[in-house]
């Protein structure tokens, strides 16, 4: 069902098969620890919990040097031939050092040089203003992508990114992409969200009725810092703000 939805959305069979083989390898390596047996399981109010220690132990046995793929690599890998950037785009890959390590030690070469450049451009860290006003940061993110000519086209699938603001004081503020996934429509008018939770945690496919539910899930997962002088995370769909994005948790 998932493969069909990905292919129907216009993603290349090669990329989809590569994703499936990564998923199979991962699940086999961790011996399906904590995974749903078949089909979909209803999400309770709490997001899925996995036994990370057990997973890590099994993973490290097979891959002592390779930390696994993460959300950004997985999402980009599915959509890499639909994403283009300026050849001389400005890159700040300071937050991607673990991604780079994973790609370096991966069992197979994931990206060409050009694709790696697009990967690092898309997920570049940006300097931003010292403010908790989300709109200011959204404009910054959009402007940077526009300047770097980041384009996502030729597919019904969309790239979902969760952008975080980090403040290290008045003069040092950054935007970075903390999570990414791929959203595809299904035949029955639902949405499938394909993600890898982290380097060590599983691949997940979640089914939502609409973007409002997806927003609820993602903000529940990632809007977690309290009392910081930082703006709320925001969610982009391709290069625009996701429709139905809103802050759910109002801080007092």
Residue ranges of each PLM-predicted region?
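Cysteine-nucleophile amide-bond enzymes
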Residues: 1-252
């Amino acid at each position: 069902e998932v493969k069909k939805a990905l292919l129907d959305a216009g993603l290349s069979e090669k990329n989809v098969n590569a994703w499936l083989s990564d998923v199979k390898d991962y699940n086999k390596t961790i011996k399906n620890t904590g995974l749903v047996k078949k089909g979909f399981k209803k999400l309770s109010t709490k997001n899925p919990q996995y036994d990370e220690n057990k997973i890590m132990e099994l993973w490290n046995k097979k891959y002592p040097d390779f930390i696994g793929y993460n959300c950004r690599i997985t999402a980009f890998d599915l959509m890499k031939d639909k994403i283009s950037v300026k050849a001389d785009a400005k890159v700040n890959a300071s937050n991607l050092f673990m991604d780079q390590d994973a790609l370096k030690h991966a069992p197979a070469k994931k990206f060409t040089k050009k694709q790696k450049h697009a990967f690092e451009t898309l997920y570049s860290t940006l300097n931003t203003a010292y403010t908790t006003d989300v709109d200011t940061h959204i404009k910054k993110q959009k402007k940077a992508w526009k300047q770097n000519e980041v384009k996502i086209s030729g597919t019904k699938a969309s790239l979902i990114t969760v952008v975080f603001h980090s403040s290290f004081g008045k003069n040092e503020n950054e935007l970075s992409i903390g999570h990414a996934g791929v959203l595809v429509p299904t035949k029955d008018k639902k949405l499938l969200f394909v993600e890898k939770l982290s380097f060590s945690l599983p691949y997940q496919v979640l089914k939502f009725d609409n973007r409002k539910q997806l927003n609820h899930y993602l903000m529940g997962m990632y809007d977690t810092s309290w009392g910081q002088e930082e703006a709320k995370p925001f969610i982009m769909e391709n290069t625009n703000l996701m429709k139905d994005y809103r802050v759910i948790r109002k801080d007092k």
